[in-house]
Amino acid sequence: MHTDLWERGCERLAAELPEQQFNTWIRPLPPADVTLAGDGVLVGLRVPNRFKLDWIRAQYGSRIEATLSELAGKPVRLELSLLPRDAVARAQGMAAAPAAQAGAAPQPTQSPMAIGAALHAAATARHDPQSVVPTPGGSANGRAAPRVGEPGGPVGTSTLPVAPTLSPAVSRGRLNPALTFDTLVPGRANQMARTAALHVVGAPGHMYNPLFIYGGVGLGKTHLIHAVGNALIRDNPDARVLYLHAEQFISDVVRNYQRKTFDELKAKYHSLDLLLIDDVQFFAGKDRTQEEFFNAFEALLAKRAHIIMTSDTYPKGLVDIDERLTSRFDAGLTVAIEPPELEMRVAILMKKSDAEGSRMPEDVAFFVAKNVRANVRELEGALRKVLAYSRFSHKEISINLAREALKDLLSIQNRQVSVENIQKTVADFYKIKIADMYSKKRPASIARPRQIAMYLAKEMTQKSLPEIGELFGGRDHTTVLHAVRKIGGERQKNTELNQQLHVLEQTLKG
């Protein structure tokens, strides 16, 4: 029989997969139902929510089947299904019970191991008096458990303010329901940030906490953190999720400072399960705001709530922000969102035009994508111009129509960005001579800026590789291609280089 097939499979997967991946996605799963099915084996797994089901199927399904087939010596088919909602709730209660019985404060999220151990029992529990599981804030007999500081309750500091529950309706009110993972176009530019965000949804409070996402304006940072909030609320409607811009937090601090009501501020922010905050660079120079955010930050991490922040620069690049904050920002995972590459820009245009009910032909999408390189926001603006021009003129969408609709934008871009301008800007930035861009000198202090200038020339102009090579002292197109690939690859890994390129791009765009 293959009764221990899943257990042996887990041991194999634990040895082969990165520890964080295994602990997040595989280890929490309840014991599998293993049955013989003809010449093969059927392995049934029950998963607590739709997001995890889709992710496990897409990322690990084939690998799980292959591993189990090898161990079983016959074909294995993996069948994933959703656990009933009440079973998930009972599992979370069972995972929390030992801590509650020991007098510990219940955590907002349980460890993957604890929840996984409880899922199977919860799914098969019978509705009898012996199987009722105490829930946080309640007891097995259905009566509410006394709170700290109440008569008959546990000994505690009754003078501390009790944090009011943040209404999920209020939390959802600040989230844009249209900004989801389904409407986010994936690509190389946002791959790391998107993957990290998906891991947060799968195991909030456990991985990449805090998650710090940085990048230029209009690249999709806000979309991504809204997607996390929407996914978490979809899977757990009672989750206390709050999205806000940094300026809103500043306003809250000022208002509560004027009213001397800082307990209200703490009650609002310290009771969350997920805090999503945009543009933390706005905290610069605001000492009281930084102090209150530090307090909220520490309180949330202590209760294993998750924090996701965005900024226009990486933590160490933030100016006039206390080092104890920036060091904590950098303590989890810091990822960049880059300007979208050509193929991603085309995919964005096609998807957005479909959503508008007007399919953009692929050749037109490539034309627009080649000419609008800055960010997703400008790309969407260009799309709206083309679609509006098509409707108003009653003409089919074509390259000529797009060229006419975007003539002002194209003339500005052509006037602003040239290879010569790029060479001058890069030379000034790295303090070398413009003549070094054309020379045959190869010291790293010159060759590196020259490669960066070639990369920017390919990314920001319409010039071909041979044309760019000619403008860099008659170099071969393969030299340019090597520079483009080298700098493009390093940009994904080197935070300092990415920041330098971001500054250069913004300077060139004016």
Swiss-Prot record:
Q: Does the record's keyword annotation contain ATP-binding?
A: yes
Q: Where in the cell is it found?
A: Cytoplasm
Instruction: Name the InterPro entries on file.
Output: AAA+_ATPase, Chromosome_initiator_DnaA, Chromosome_initiator_DnaA-like, Chromosome_initiator_DnaA_CS, DnaA_C, DnaA_dom, DnaA_N_dom, DnaA_N_sf
Q: Where is this region: Domain II?
A: 74-173
Biological process GO annotation list?
A: DNA replication initiation; regulation of DNA replication
Q: Where is this region: Domain I, interacts with DnaA modulators?
A: 1-74
- Where is this protein primarily located? cytoplasm
Q: Which UniProt keywords apply?
A: ATP-binding, Cytoplasm, DNA replication, DNA-binding, Lipid-binding, Nucleotide-binding
- What SMART domains does this protein's entry cite? AAA (SM00382), Bac_DnaA_C (SM00760)
Single GO cellular component term:
plasma membrane
Q: Which GO terms describe its molecular function?
A: ATP binding; ATP hydrolysis activity; DNA replication origin binding; lipid binding
Write out the ranges of the annotated region (Disordered): 125-168
Q: Which residues bind ATP?
A: 218, 220-222
Q: Which domain of life is it from?
A: Bacteria
- Report residue spans for region: Domain IV, binds dsDNA: 391-510
Q: What does this protein do?
A: Plays an essential role in the initiation and regulation of chromosomal replication. ATP-DnaA binds to the origin of replication (oriC) to initiate formation of the DNA replication initiation complex once per cell cycle. Binds the DnaA box (a 9 base pair repeat at the origin) and separates the double-stranded (ds)DNA. Forms a right-handed helical filament on oriC DNA; dsDNA binds to the exterior of the filament while single-stranded (ss)DNA is stabiized in the filament's interior.
Q: How does it assemble?
A: Oligomerizes as a right-handed, spiral filament on DNA at oriC.
User: Which PANTHER family does the entry mention?
Assistant: CHROMOSOMAL REPLICATION INITIATOR PROTEIN DNAA
Q: Which family does it belong to?
A: Belongs to the DnaA family.
From the Swiss-Prot or TrEMBL record, give the protein name.
Chromosomal replication initiator protein DnaA
